[in-house]
Amino acid sequence: IYNGAYYVEGTAKDISVSSALTKLDNGKYYYITASGTIFKPSGSGIYKADNGRRYYFYSNGSVEHVTKTGIRKIGKKAYYFNSNSSVKSTGKTHFAKISGKTYRISSKGYLLTGWQKIGKNKYYMSKKSYARIENKTTTVSGHKYWFDKTGKVITSKWKYKNGSRRYYFDKKGRMLTNTSKKIGKYVYFFNKNGVLQRNLISYKGYNWVLSHPLK
């Protein structure tokens, strides 16, 4: 600081704002605290400013500046930004519903992907869109899973389709395919597409006449 000017990376600017972002002569944005000083992070990442918002700061003190709401990837992590450059984060890992889609945001502010276990329930966050998979059957690592409207994996349950096709999802939530399985008192057969087989089938070199209680 010299005569009210702040010097950052060889540039200087008189700063009259506080608790806000400002653009310096080097073209980068910085956060000016309520006391009028430039916020200096201990390293790159999400920090909560004294205006209550969280921003992504680089180690040199500059802020990731955005003008459009949406997901932006920085390095190997993705973040959901508001149009004022703040990051959607509470400082705790949580689900956040944004524009009709649900995301899982970590305590450090980045979007989580893959399997998420909460209590006894499991959810899956898309590695492509980052959103939670809901109300559909989808393939994950070679297995098909059935997700309800809240995104929870459905386990140990029959699924009916088109009034006649039956599928079964085991205790891990995986759809049974190309196998036989004892469910309750009965043994059932499923083809490579997971459809429950009826009547006469060929399985492991033998012909089987199927009779089971499902109607």
Predicted regions and their residues:
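Extracellular adhesion/carbohydrate-binding repeat motifs centered on closely spaced tryptophans
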Residues: 1-215
